[in-house]
A protein has these predicted regions:
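FAD-binding core of FAD-dependent oxidoreductases
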Residues: 70-85, 125-127, 153-158, 164
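Contiguous, small/hydrophobic- and glycine-enriched helical/loop subdomains that border
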Residues: 83-126
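Intrinsic disorder/low-complexity segments
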Residues: 142-160
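Short, conserved charged micro-motifs
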Residues: 53-55, 94-99, 178, 212-215
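Residues forming anionic-ligand binding surfaces in small-molecule and nucleic-acid pockets
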Residues: 71-90, 188-206
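Active-site loop/lid in soluble adenylation, ligation, and acyl-transfer enzymes
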Residues: 1-52, 137, 199-259
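Active-site cofactor/substrate anionic-group-binding motifs, chiefly glycine-
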Residues: 53-76
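A structural signal for small-residue-enriched, beta-sheet-centric alpha/beta enzyme cores
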Residues: 138-141, 158-217
């Protein structure tokens, strides 16, 4: 599998990495691609969610947490620099088959780290009965150059293919108060109760391994990928242009389902 590398140290907005996933799916011909990313405190919510119902926007503004909408379904996710986000792009089309393949790969890597991980029918990765990773899926259709034989002549044309994107979290550590506060009512008592409840339902990778987060990332990359493709400055610029769609207020706030 090919690791897609930015070859830069800086941390970008979450919207850039969403655009990068989509760009890779639409422009790279490799059958399987993978990359990891980290972001400053952010909330990412699903394509069909109502941001005003699902996200505590006041809490996010007060605590410097950015808000983004993704093109996959599913619920709200809080991310910060203490956890890592995984992106997997493949030519496979069927959602559950793609999920199962991806989840099996990640669970197998965690097991090689000595962690007794498993996955559920809801496409979560668990350690025991606690969640360490949530994942979502969406599909894109794109075209690649091809050659077609017409009347005995080789004629340039395009072929339309489907690409699947799976992205998810891997909780190494996190700011639990922000995780809960960003997606729950602002009442202090409810926030405290929410933190306690979340602590009972999720687990942190740091409690199950002696590896640091950079070591975990290196281990995953080393076991899942066998070659690297580094994006060119031109390709990064194209991703930045695509990112503008994800930054549009109309996209973030204007796609709320009708009540």
């Amino acid at each position: 599998m090919t690791y897609v590398d930015l070859n830069e140290e800086k941390t970008r907005r979450l919207s850039f990495y969403l655009a990068m996933e989509e760009w890779v799916a639409r422009h790279m011909a490799e059958p399987e691609c993978f990359f990891m990313w980290q972001v400053e405190p952010s909330v990412i919510f699903g394509r069909n969610q109502d941001v005003y119902s699902e996200v505590n926007l006041d809490y996010c503004r007060q605590n410097g947490i950015q808000v983004y909408r993704r093109k996959s379904g599913g619920g709200c996710v809080y991310a910060d620099m203490s956890n890592v986000m995984l992106a997997y792009i493949t030519t496979a089309n069927e959602a559950q088959t793609t999920f199962d393949h991806y989840l099996r790969m990640v669970v197998d890597v965690l097991k090689q780290m000595g962690i007794a991980a498993s996955w559920t029918e809801h496409n979560d990765i668990m350690i025991g009965d606690r969640k360490v990773s949530g994942n979502a899926f969406y599909h894109v259709t794109t075209s690649f150059p091809a050659i077609q034989a017409i009347d005995g002549k080789q004629t340039p044309t395009e072929t339309t293919v489907g690409r699947s994107i799976v992205h998810g979290t891997l909780l190494y550590d996190t700011n639990m108060r922000n995780m809960v506060g960003a997606i729950t009512p602002s009442d202090e008592k409810m926030l405290k109760h929410g933190v306690q409840s979340v602590r009972q339902r999720i687990c942190l990778l740091k409690d199950h391994t002696k590896m640091t987060l950079p070591e975990v990332k290196a281990f995953i990359r080393g076991h899942l990928t066998n070659q690297t493709l580094t994006l060119t400055p031109k390709e990064v610029t194209e991703i930045e242009q695509l990112e503008q769609e994800y930054l549009s207020p109309e996209w973030i706030f204007g796609h709320n389902p009708k009540h």
